[in-house]
UniProtKB/Swiss-Prot annotation:
Belongs to the UPF0301 (AlgH) family. GO terms for cellular component: cytosol. This is UPF0301 protein Ssed_1237. It holds the Pfam family DUF179. PANTHER family: UNCHARACTERIZED PROTEIN YQGE, UPF0301 PROTEIN YQGE.
């Protein structure tokens, strides 16, 4: 099994699941036990500033205007739990280095740093995550539910949320609408 860590999963057009339809998921972990990822293209309608106020992390949070300023739905698993995908800046509590250029943090201290001089340069705040049990993701890939591509910082941090699925499909180099959703058919 080849690990898909640091890859994007792109939902096939035939995936009509209301939660994952046209989703792009960054795979944080993928091993023999399963996989874990964060959906990167579904804002939930709340700004990071509002979240910081609700969590009482800042009384008057600075306006955070980067693309990471909206809170995203990361996935259906533990939607009350926050995850921050970010460029390395400092080491916060509960930080995991995913690559040399990307970390995942689940502690409140990284949220407190947002809008300050110690904030990561680029970040995504998400609630919940997408998870797969042992061999589940491999089965879904075999069923043509997902396509995968290597992750890029540009798609992760510099592309508007609503454009991420289209940009990801364009990076495949072919028209995704021409693919069959049936295994073994082109």
């Amino acid at each position: 099994m080849e690990s898909l860590q640091n890859h994007f999963l792109i939902a096939m057009p035939s995936l009509k699941d209301t939660f994952f339809e046209r989703s792009v998921i960054y795979i944080c972990e993928h091993d023999e036990k399963g996989a874990m990822g964060i959906m990167i293209n579904r804002p939930i309608g709340i700004e990071v500033n509002e979240l910081l106020l609700q969590m009482q992390l800042k009384e008057e949070p600075e306006l955070i205007t980067s693309l990471g300023s909206k809170v995203l739905i990361g996935g259906p698993v533990t939607p009350e739990r926050g995850f921050v995908l970010h460029t390395p800046q400092s080491t916060w509590n509960n930080s995991q280095s995913l690559t040399d250029e990307l970390m995942l943090t689940t502690s409140r201290d990284v949220l407190s740093a947002l809008g300050s001089d110690t904030a990561p340069e680029q970040f995504i705040v998400a609630l919940g995550y997408a998870g797969w049990s042992r061999d589940q993701l491999e089965q879904e890939l075999a069923e043509n539910t997902w396509l995968s591509i290597p992750a890029t910082a540009e798609l992760l941090f510099s592309t508007e949320y609503e454009d991420r699925w289209q940009r990801a499909t364009e990076s495949l180099g072919f028209d995704i609408w021409q693919l069959s959703n049936q295994t073994g058919h082109a």
